[in-house]
């Protein structure tokens, strides 16, 4: 199959070609490091009825994959583990990356992060400087990947977007609906309580000034200005409290991958 039009965040093998078997992510690979994929060289094996069948080894389970009639594709699917293995070099400016869950992804050469689209994985993969691993060179152990983002479910539209802050209780703008929401509920709750408290204090001060300076205000009309300022500050604080109390909250889909 051609990989030129494949989305960078989707698996290279779509569900329409995978039959009724859905690839799963083995839990024991969670600490593995993503690696760049080079197409392994395919070889020919002899069989009694043919002169030679081109085959390659699966990069996941090492089973033999028959390439007969598939040499025009960029990747092929293993019939044993249902994972993809590249047989051609990626398009210009692209590279293959295999997620620790064994999902084969394609992304730009300059990409630093990529998200795994599998529902049971959803890792945020920090590519960094990726070393190309040839078929003859065994994979070297790598340091654990430091999390640099998390997936957040928008409180307005319900879509998931990548939030690169390492702390919650901040405001975020959804790239899908372009609306502002709070990542976590602690920030709007604290600010709502703070504005309600300040607003009520200003209102009480304004009422006290109004009652206590009735006679004084008849002689000095500038006293009305202090009344107006106190009432206005209290009203502004209460309006801000209503804003923070009604703001939508977006929650992280799960902890850091």
From Swiss-Prot:
Superkingdom of origin organism: Eukaryota
InterPro entries found in the cross-reference section: PtdIns-P2-Ptase (IPR019178)
Pfam families in alphabetical order: Tmemb_55A (PF09788)
GO cellular component, one term: late endosome membrane
Root EC class: hydrolase
Span(s) of short sequence motif CX5R motif: 107-113
Gene Ontology annotations of biological process type: negative regulation of phagocytosis; phosphatidylinositol dephosphorylation
Enzyme Commission number(s): 3.1.3.78
Name under which the protein is recorded: Type 2 phosphatidylinositol 4,5-bisphosphate 4-phosphatase
Organism, scientific name: Mus musculus
């Amino acid at each position: 199959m051609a990989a030129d039009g494949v989305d960078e965040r989707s698996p290279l093998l779509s569900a329409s070609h995978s039959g009724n078997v859905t690839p799963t992510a083995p839990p024991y690979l969670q600490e593995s490091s993503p690696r760049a994929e080079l197409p392994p060289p395919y070889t020919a094996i002899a069989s009694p009825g043919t002169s030679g069948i081109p085959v390659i080894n699966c990069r996941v389970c090492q089973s033999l994959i028959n390439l007969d009639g598939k040499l025009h594709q960029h990747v092929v699917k293993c019939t044993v583990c249902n994972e993809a293995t590249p047989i051609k070099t990626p398009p210009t400016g692209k590279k293959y990356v295999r997620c620790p869950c064994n999902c084969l992804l394609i992304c730009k050469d300059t990409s630093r992060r990529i998200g795994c689209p599998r529902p049971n994985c959803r890792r945020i993969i920090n590519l960094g400087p990726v070393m190309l691993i040839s078929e003859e060179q065994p994979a070297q152990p790598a340091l654990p990947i430091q999390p640099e983002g998390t997936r957040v479910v928008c409180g307005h539209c319900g879509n998931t977007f990548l939030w690169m802050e390492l702390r919650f209780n901040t405001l975020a703008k959804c790239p899908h609906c372009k609306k502002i929401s709070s990542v976590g509920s602690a920030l709007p709750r604290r600010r709502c309580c703070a504005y309600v408290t300040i607003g009520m204090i200003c209102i009480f001060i304004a009422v006290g000034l109004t009652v206590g300076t009735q006679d004084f205000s008849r002689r000095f009309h500038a006293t009305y200005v202090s009344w107006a300022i106190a009432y206005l500050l209290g009203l502004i604080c209460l309006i801000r409290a209503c804003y923070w109390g009604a703001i939508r909250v977006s929650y992280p889909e799960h902890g850091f991958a």
